[in-house]
Amino acid sequence: DFVFKISETDTVLVKEIKPDNNTRDMEKLAASIVDTLQGDHYIKAVVGIGTPIGNIKDLASSFKEAQIAMEVGKVFDTERQVISYDHLGIARLIYQLPTTLCEAFLREVFKQESIDSLDAETLFTIQRFFENNLNVSETSRGLFVHRNTLVYRLEKIRKLTGLDLRNFDDAIVFKVALMVKKYLSANPAKY
């Protein structure tokens, strides 16, 4: 194992892992390092994890992935302190898009209405609906509202955006649009 201090605020740990270790094992180790730094030394830490490599010549690539993981995490998952490149998913793709393309996508999706026209309660409802896998009953229970109230809110969103969030394809488009909006808010002038 090697530790390198590359700047005043950045340190790199190169960890040898056994073949049977996986990314989850690395995330657990990283979380324990973060806990130690914060608990014992009062140092705020965020850890990015690159993909495991089999050859030392790929070290730079894995390091770059760890940096990207932290950058993407700052935009899409600000609460997490350990971010693995392998688990960035669609956020990694969105992060690499030019802002002009993202802005065009939002205009296409929301046509005359802006995503900004959705109030905080509506966005909270949508977020909970997504977290409950588009399940109306579970979401209404979690929000402590009547099922019909949730259906009414979803219908209101459909009228406003043209997207029926109970439809999987529409829900994906809306989820990506929310992520694109978050990305644009964090990176207003890329490309």
Predicted regions and their residues:
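Cytosolic nucleotide-utilizing catalytic cores of signal-transduction proteins
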Residues: D1-Y191
